[in-house]
Every structure is written in structure tokens, then in C-alpha cells.
């Protein structure tokens, strides 16, 4: 990976080093070196808006180039708002946009422009971007070898049998176009990245939730709160990728717009057809020396226009049938990764449901503890009421007036016994009433 970083990073120009050395060594009027450690050429490039891009062609070859924003807009025929989606300084939701000459992909760390001939990425040291570049190179080189092998086999079979060649001369190799292969690798990288994050979250979440159910503490609750925040953010990102793929699958026009190789081939074919038509008309033009028959020329022109209209209608019908097949091909590709991202979303949904179940279980435990505290408080209140009865009796007998009851020696004992029995009866009556009303467990 370090070798790839060194290969993809643009080398520092010698002029920049000279300017930097000169700025360091040249003394100023005050005796201090001006612009100490400042890359003057780098500041100039930033002022011009030059950015480093990684270019991957159809053969898997990489190239680092520095292009400004307006040149990139003209090169890919993109508006400025689409290029802002690729800026790593801004946070945008996952988006896949099909334009006239390019596909703008913004899937997590993978932000690139896919054309019919190349893939353009902002030069970055992010490991996921470098892995995407490496995987794209390997896939493109493997597919190019497979196409060469298939072409050699087709040539060999064509030499062996002419009938076999006549039967299968119109068959095309079962390979995806370049833009679909690049898009597939971007989808695979994004889905793999999100699925790995979901798996890491699962590994961390389930033991923590099990520990929380057995021991409720402030530390565990704080850890679960942070875990749930991460889960909500990750679920939102996965949901956005899933919605973007589903939106593409539901719109046939957007899928047809993403078939860049076919559009390029049609454009080249139409230009070639126009040139051949102009050449045909110039070759069939009337010479000056030959006599012109006013009767035979209009039917020839009508016959020519009729043949051209028939050829155009056949071309349009063939184009529509090929477009339907290509849309179906792209739809199958998107459907495969829709299943993958939907599985990741189901995994996160199951984890969220497990967290909700744990929260419900904890709430039930807390409700049970709160009910026990309420029952205990009810018993204390009842006991306080019974003790208050003793206080009332003591207050009555503590008044300063003459009672004959004070002169009897065993009267105080009977007062205590009768008061205690009455208090016990009152307390038992309250407890029975609470159990009868199911305010306390039986």
C-alpha cells in the first residue's frame, strides 16, 4: 500500500524546490529569510484551483494529473454542482448521477467520475480509495486478458468452421461495459465498507447489551448511548445507499442514461452515417456534362429518401431493443448489490430491535424496583399511622388533669396492651386491604 501511495502521489516539481530553497536562502531587508518553509508554487496552484486527480483507463493503467475545476467540467461535460459532490471537504449523502458523458459516484469514501474511457478520482491517501484503485486495476487487467482470450478462441473457431462463424458472428462477448465494471467495483467497495462497519458494531454491541441486562450501571448506560448514536448514523448512511440504488432501479430513464459506451458508439455511428450519407449524395450527384431527365430524377430521390427512412427506422428499433437489454443488464447488476445493502440494513435493524428489547427489559426491571419501593413506602406509611395512634394515646394520658385511672397500679399495663392490639389489628386490616386491592403481592 505504501508503494501505491508513492506511485499515486504527484512528484514535487523541481521549480517548486528551487523556489522554496531560494525563498529560504534569500535574505530580506530586515535580515530574516522571507516565506520560510512556504511552497510558493503550491500556493500558486491552489490559487489557480489545480487539484490532483487519479486517472484509470480501460486497460487498468493509472496516471496522476493536475487539472483545474473548469477543465474537468469541460472534459466530462458536468455542471459545477456535480463536482462539489466529489469535494472531500463537504459532506454529501450517497449519490449516483447519470449524465450525458459521465457517471458521478459519491458512495462513502469512493467519490469518482466514470466515463466511457476512464475513471477519475481525487488523489487521496485514504486506504479505501487506494484499495478501490488497486481493485479496479486488477479487474480491468483481468477482463482485458479475458477479452483477448475470447477473441483468440473466436478466431480459432472461425477458422475451423464457416458455418459456426455464420451462426454466431453477431454474438457479443458476455462482458460488462467499462462504466458498469467501474460502477460495480464502487458499489462493492461501498457495500463492503458498510457491512464491515455493521459487523464491528454487532461484535461490540451484543456483549455490552448482555452485560447491561445483568448489571445496570451509569458506565454501561453511557456506552450503550454512544453505541446507539453510532447505530443511528450508520443506519442512515446504509438507508441512503439502499434508497439510491432502489431509485435507480425504478427509473428506466436514469439507467439508460448511464450506458455511456452505447451512447458513445451511437454518436460515432451517427457521425459516420452522416458522413457516408454526404459522400453517397456527392457521388450520386449529377454531372454537368451529362443530360438530365426531368422525369426520372424525382422517383430516384423519393426512392433514396424511402430507403433512408427505412434504414433509420430499423436503426431506431435495434437501438430500442439494445437499450432494453442494456437496462435489464444494469438492473441485474444493481439488484445484486441492492440485496447486499438490504442485508446490511436488515442486520442493523435487527441490532436496533435488540437494543430496543434490552431497553424494554431494563424499563421493566426499573418499573419492578419502583413498584417495590412504592410498596415499601406504603407499608412504612401504614406503620407510621399505627405509631401515631400510640402517640395520640400517650398525648391523652399525658394531659395535666386528675383521672381515677392513674391511681390504679395495673392500669398503665392494660393501656399498652389494648393500644398495641388495636394498632396490630389496624395494621393487619390495612395490609389485607392492600392485598385485596392487589396493591401488594400476595
Swiss-Prot record:
Expressed in the whole plant except stems. One of its GO terms (molecular function) is magnesium ion transmembrane transporter activity. A motif (Required for magnesium transport activity) lies at residues 398-400. It is found in: Membrane. Residues 1-30 are annotated as: Disordered. Its main location: membrane. It comes from the Eukaryota. It is a multi-pass membrane protein. The chain crosses the membrane at residues 378-398, 414-434. InterPro entries: CorA_TM1_TM2 (IPR045863), MRS2-like (IPR039204). One of its GO terms (cellular component) is plant-type vacuole. Keywords: Ion transport, Magnesium, Membrane, Transmembrane, Transmembrane helix, Transport. It holds the Pfam family MRS2-like. Has the ability to complement a mutant in yeast lacking magnesium transport capability. Magnesium transporter that may mediate the influx of magnesium. Belongs to the CorA metal ion transporter (MIT) (TC 1.A.35.5) family. This is Magnesium transporter MRS2-1. The gene is MRS2-1.
Amino acid at each position: 500500500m505504501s508503494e501505491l501511495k508513492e506511485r499515486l502521489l504527484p512528484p514535487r516539481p523541481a521549480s517548486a524546490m528551487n523556489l522554496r530553497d531560494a525563498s529560504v536562502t534569500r535574505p530580506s531587508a530586515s535580515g530574516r529569510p522571507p516565506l520560510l518553509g512556504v511552497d510558493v508554487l503550491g500556493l500558486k496552484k491552489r490559487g489557480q484551483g489545480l487539484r490532483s486527480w487519479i486517472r484509470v483507463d480501460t486497460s487498468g493503467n493509472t496516471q496522476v494529473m493536475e487539472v483545474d475545476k473548469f477543465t474537468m467540467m469541460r472534459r466530462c461535460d458536468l455542471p459545477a454542482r456535480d463536482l462539489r459532490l466529489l469535494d472531500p471537504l463537504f459532506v454529501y449523502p450517497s449519490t449516483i448521477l447519470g449524465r450525458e458523458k459521465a457517471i458521478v459516484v459519491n458512495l462513502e469514501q469512493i467519490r469518482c467520475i466514470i466515463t466511457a474511457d476512464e475513471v477519475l478520482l481525487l488523489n487521496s491517501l485514504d486506504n479505501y480509495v487506494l484499495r478501490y484503485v488497486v481493485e479496479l486495476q486488477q479487474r480491468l487487467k483481468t477482463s482485458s486478458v479475458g477479452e483477448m482470450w475470447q477473441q483468440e478462441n473466436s478466431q480459432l473457431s472461425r477458422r475451423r468452421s464457416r458455418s459456426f462463424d455464420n451462426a454466431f458472428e453477431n454474438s457479443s462477448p458476455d462482458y460488462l461495459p467499462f462504466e458498469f465494471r467501474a460502477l460495480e467495483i464502487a458499489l462493492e467497495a461501498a457495500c463492503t465498507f458498510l457491512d464491515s462497519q455493521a459487523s464491528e458494531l454487532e461484535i461490540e454491541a451484543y456483549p455490552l447489551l448482555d452485560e447491561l441486562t445483568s448489571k445496570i450501571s451509569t458506565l454501561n448506560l453511557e456506552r450503550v448511548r454512544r453505541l446507539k448514536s453510532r447505530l443511528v448514523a450508520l443506519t442512515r448512511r446504509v438507508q441512503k445507499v439502499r434508497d439510491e440504488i432502489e431509485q435507480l432501479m425504478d427509473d428506466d430513464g436514469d439507467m439508460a442514461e448511464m450506458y455511456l459506451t452505447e451512447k458513445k458508439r451511437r454518436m460515432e455511428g451517427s457521425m459516420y452515417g452522416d458522413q457516408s450519407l454526404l459522400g453517397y449524395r456527392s457521388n450520386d450527384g449529377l454531372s454537368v456534362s451529362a443530360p438530365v431527365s426531368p422525369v426520372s430524377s424525382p422517383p430516384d430521390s423519393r426512392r433514396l429518401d424511402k430507403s433512408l427512412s427505412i434504414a433509420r427506422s430499423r436503426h431506431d428499433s435495434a437501438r430500442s431493443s439494445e437499450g432494453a437489454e442494456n437496462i435489464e443488464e444494469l438492473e441485474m447488476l444493481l439488484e445484486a448489490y441492492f440485496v447486499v445493502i438490504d442485508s446490511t440494513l436488515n442486520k442493523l435493524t435487527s441490532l436496533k430491535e435488540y437494543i430496543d428489547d434490552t431497553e424494554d427489559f431494563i424499563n421493566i426491571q426499573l418499573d419492578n424496583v419502583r413498584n417495590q419501593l412504592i410498596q415499601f413506602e406504603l407499608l412504612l406509611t401504614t406503620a407510621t399511622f399505627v405509631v401515631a395512634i400510640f402517640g395520640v394515646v400517650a398525648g391523652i394520658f399525658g394531659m395535666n388533669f386528675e383521672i381515677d385511672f392513674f391511681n390504679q397500679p395495673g392500669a398503665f399495663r392494660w393501656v399498652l396492651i389494648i393500644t398495641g392490639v388495636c394498632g396490630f389489628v389496624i395494621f393487619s386490616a390495612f395490609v389485607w386491604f392492600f392485598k385485596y386491592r392487589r396493591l401488594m403481592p400476595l
